[in-house]
Design a protein with these regions (language model features):
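Outer-envelope beta-barrel architecture signal
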Residues: 48-56, 136-140, 255-259, 306-308, ...
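Outer-membrane beta-barrel transmembrane strands
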Residues: 1, 21-69, 104-158, 215-258, ...
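Extracytoplasmic loops and strand-loop junctions of Gram-negative outer membrane beta-barrel proteins
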Residues: 19-26, 108-115, 178-179, 187-192, ...
Length: 585
């Protein structure tokens, strides 16, 4: 770098970079998805007054996904780049090169190709039954449910074999486009073409056909991860739940109060599998875990005036832990056999204790004004920790260990007695408190224009953490957000214009790129959308013609790295227009 200038946060604001290179990383995606679902059910009424109701339901789904995403990376000639970061949503990066010219002199030095495919299979099965005694306003309900979900992810990688054909000359160790390469440097330009965004792209059909891609893709061996970041492995989860619930209605000070309370008991059994490579030997490891929770809840609504309702509710909810942190991913390379790294199948779920208090004032028709105060107290966050476990619980075959590792275990009493310190994700003791306010106003304007109306919604969130191992904030939660909708609905026609706004928000944990304080942040953003429909009432089943326009003003999505002027990425999703017809038969 020449003449580099920094601001007070050490963010580069200007510089000249000599001996710089651009690179193209082109990656076409091809996905094939299959899915089926069946969901039978029935409702049965019993009793002399038909006030005993039995609802039964079953469900089953299965889906398959196959994704291929070959990568081609080529580099430009060395050049001098002028960098300016002096305002705006992105820095200015200029050079004398025409980056949309396939004949610029693009080459393989520093380049690569990848064959990285992914297959996923998901299967679910479930059944539930609910038995209600009494009418809908006053009753007791009991029920049970069973759910099974199984997901398998498999990554495949044949990059080295493809590189041997494309640019290593069938025998080299470096991708340099030398003699014997299917696409040598001299021919590379003919496999490139101008791109739609002012930067070259690849002629994928020719490139893949001339480099034996399809045969190598089909022969790709399984790898421990996919290029999407997902780890190879599977998880099977079985949930069994029981609940009892009561609904009641009574007069309190001559005002109607509606009450709902219940408790749910849930048990979860998980079986987690994944590949483990120890000293060059690859095997599949199976880990089991289970947990159970009791989840109470209640809701009270009281008509304190003719058009005013006050509400109070509380509940305890459960969110499953991250499956990727529970996969084995065992590494046991310590010569002394004292330490290892591994996923933790025994991670406990996130638990949230929730309290909401608020009310609504009904102004007539569909109109009302509402205000709610809410609090969520969340536990179950994870941090890196150490678990000391018996060697036999590590899931590693003793016969695959090196002699020096077997000797280390023997010095500590042998494989049946020795313990191992495992670095893994563990549940932290801290708590994250999320408190907030939500206000809503829905108002028909029929007196001004028949069918016209609007709705406004505003939410403010404040977050505080207590104890160790808890993030300062929950990622992806904006401190302020609001949306407004203007609508017109009349007979067969309707149209809605909506605007949504989110404040700046944190979207990642700390320690990004090894910088302790660095987080990724999303810029504040507003988006305008429209939806409209018209029902063809004179046709059978009254089909609707629909029009949906998303992101009318073409707003971009921008994220920054720690500081507002350090652009991390800028994504322009564009404007989406969908015209369709919807009906039943």
């Amino acid at each position: 770098p020449l003449g580099m200038q920094l601001d007070q946060n050490n963010v580069v604001t200007s510089a000249t970079f000599a001996n710089a290179q651009y690179f193209l990383e082109a990656r076409p995606y091809h996905e094939n998805v299959k899915f089926w679902s069946v969901n039978p059910g029935a409702e049965l009424l019993f009793g002399a007054e038909q006030d005993i109701k039995l609802n039964v339901q079953a469900n089953a789904t299965r889906s398959w996904l196959a994704r291929e995403s070959p990568s081609i990376l080529v580099t430009s000639p060395f050049t001098t780049v002028d960098y300016r970061n002096e305002g705006g949503d992105r820095p200015s990066i200029t050079s004398p090169l025409d980056l949309n010219d396939p004949n610029l002199g693009w080459g393989w030095t520093g380049g690569r190709v990848n064959i990285q495919n992914e297959k996923r299979q998901t299967e679910t099965r479930g059944a539930r039954a609910d038995l209600q005694f009494g009418e809908d306003k006053r009753n007791v309900k009991i029920g049970a449910s069973y759910d099974m979900a199984e997901r398998t992810i498999r990554g495949f990688d044949n990059s080295t074999a493809w590189e041997q054909v494309v640019c290593r000359g069938n025998g080299g160790n470096v991708c340099n486009g030398g003699a014997g390469s299917a696409i040598p440097n001299a021919a590379l330009a003919s496999y490139l073409k101008p791109g739609p965004g002012g930067f070259i792209t690849a002629d994928f059909s020719r490139f893949l056909a001339d480099t034996n891609y399809y045969a190598l893709r089909d022969a790709a061996p399984e790898s421990n991860s996919a290029n999407t970041g997902a780890s190879t492995g599977g998880i099977r989860e079985k949930n069994l739940g029981f609940y009892i619930e009561t609904n009641a209605e009574a007069d309190v000070w001559n005002r109607t109060m509606r009450f709902n309370a219940g408790v749910r008991y849930v048990t979860t059994d998980q079986t987690i599998t994944g590949p483990v490579t120890i000293n060059g030997v690859r095997s599949v490891q199976v880990l089991d875990s289970d947990y159970k929770e009791t989840l109470p809840s209640f809701n009270v609504a009281w008509d304190v005036a003719d058009k005013v309702v006050m509400r109070l509710s509380s509940s305890r909810t459960l969110t499953r832990p991250d499956p990727s942190a529970m996969l084995p991913n065992t590494n046991f390379s310590d010569p002394s056999a004292q330490t290892a790294t591994q996923g933790n199948p025994n991670l406990k779920p996130y638990l949230s204790t929730n309290v909401d208090f608020g009310g609504e004032w009904y102004t007539g028709g569909e109109g009302y004004v509402g205000l709610t105060l809410f609090n969520k107290r969340i536990t179950g966050f994870t941090v890196n920790g150490i678990r000391r476990i018996p060697f036999n619980d590590l899931g590693v075959n003793y016969d695959t260990l090196l002699p020096i590792q077997q000797a280390g275990l023997a010095q500590r009493g042998g494989p049946n007695a020795a313990t191992v310190d495992v670095q893994t994700q563990v549940n932290a003791d801290g708590v994250l408190n999320i408190r907030g306010t939500e206000a809503i106003w829905v108002q028909p304007l029929d007196k001004l224009f028949d069918g016209l109306g609007f709705s406004l919604n505003y939410t403010h969130v404040n977050q505080q953490s207590e104890g160790e191992g808890v993030p300062a904030v929950a990622v992806g939660v904006a401190p302020n957000l609001w949306n407004g909708t203007v609508y017109w609905e009349k007979d067969a026609a309707s149209i809605r214009l909506s605007y949504t706004w989110n404040d700046d928000m944190v979207i990642s944990g700390a320690n990004q790129n090894g910088i302790p304080y660095a987080r990724l942040n999303a810029d504040a953003r507003g988006q305008l959308d429209m939806s409209a429909s018209y029902a063809l009432d004179w046709l059978p089943s009254k089909p609707q013609i629909t029009l949906n326009i998303t992101n009318i003003t073409n707003e971009p999505l921008r994220t920054t790295f720690a500081w507002p002027n350090a652009t991390y990425d800028l994504y322009e999703p564009g404007r989406t227009v969908m015209l369709g017809i919807r009906g039943t038969f």
